[in-house]
């Protein structure tokens, strides 16, 4: 009887631990994509741009100088930097490059890059190029911790990305530091450049929802029909005053 109770307790504990884990990738099927199409476009901003507040540097001021506020970067031709573009609901397509690692560096008391997208099964390499201690604390939107690593100067740590979702990155030593890692179950994601441009390739033909996310301007979705061997143009416009514009 005692052994049975012990086994039941262990099973219950395992169930609780599984429930606490972020959502795992089970739905995406990797195939050889034939006659794949592509989607490209721009993410732009319209309307009056807000004045971004200066970051409050409260510690290690001799090292942490001129840290920019990267929460809203608008480049030439009103292009929006650091928007995440993803295909929603895609269940099969090209393989995830699992040996591909995404680097997140601590440099001049800021995370670099500020926003990136990755796939479940890939890795993020955490670095500290500063001469001071940093931490890299990644938490998903549901507040389940992904990883929390202390990085002394010059230290490197490699962490697997095991679940899909938006991870917000913070440094517990320097509270103004922030970054985002947008993790999807598939490889169809992109980050807009300084001109607001993006591109997705080798997409299986079909109809999809294309979603754009930005930390300050919200989200927007549009339908796209991907045709065999063809390039589709799909542009987005976001407004600081009204949020995402459909």
Q: What are these regions, as identified by a protein language model?
A:
Residues 1-6:
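N-terminal secretory signal peptides that target proteins for export/translocation
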Residues 8-10, 26:
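Sequence-pattern detector for short linear motifs
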Residues 27-246:
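Extracytoplasmic copper-binding redox domains, predominantly the cupredoxin/blue-copper superfamily
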Residues 11-20:
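Bacterial N-terminal signal peptides
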Residues 21-27:
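Sec/Tat signal peptide C-region and signal peptidase I cleavage site
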């Amino acid at each position: 009887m005692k052994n049975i109770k012990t086994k039941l307790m262990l099973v219950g504990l395992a169930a609780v631990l599984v429930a606490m884990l972020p959502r795992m990738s089970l739905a995406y099927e990797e195939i050889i994509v034939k006659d794949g199409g592509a989607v490209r476009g721009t993410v732009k901003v319209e309307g009056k741009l807000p004045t971004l507040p200066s970051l409050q540097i409260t510690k290690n001021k001799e090292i942490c100088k001129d840290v920019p506020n990267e929460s809203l970067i608008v480049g030439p031709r009103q292009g929006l930097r650091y928007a995440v573009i993803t295909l929603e609901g895609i269940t099969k397509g090209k393989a995830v490059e699992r040996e591909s690692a995404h680097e997140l560096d601590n440099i001049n008391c800021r995370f670099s890059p500020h926003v990136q997208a990755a796939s479940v099964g890939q890795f993020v390499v955490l670095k500290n190029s500063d001469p001071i201690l940093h931490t890299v604390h990644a938490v998903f939107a549901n507040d389940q911790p992904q990883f929390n690593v202390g990085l002394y100067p010059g230290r490197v740590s490699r962490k697997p990305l095991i679940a899909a979702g938006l991870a917000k990155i913070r440094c517990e030593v320097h509270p103004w530091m922030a970054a985002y890692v947008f993790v999807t179950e598939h490889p169809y994601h992109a980050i807009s450049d300084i001109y607001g441009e993006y591109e997705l390739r080798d997409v299986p033909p079909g109809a999809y929802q294309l979603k754009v996310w930005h930390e300050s301007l919200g989200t927007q979705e549009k339908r796209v029909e991907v045709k065999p061997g063809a390039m589709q143009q799909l542009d987005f416009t976001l407004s600081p005053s009204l949020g995402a514009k459909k």
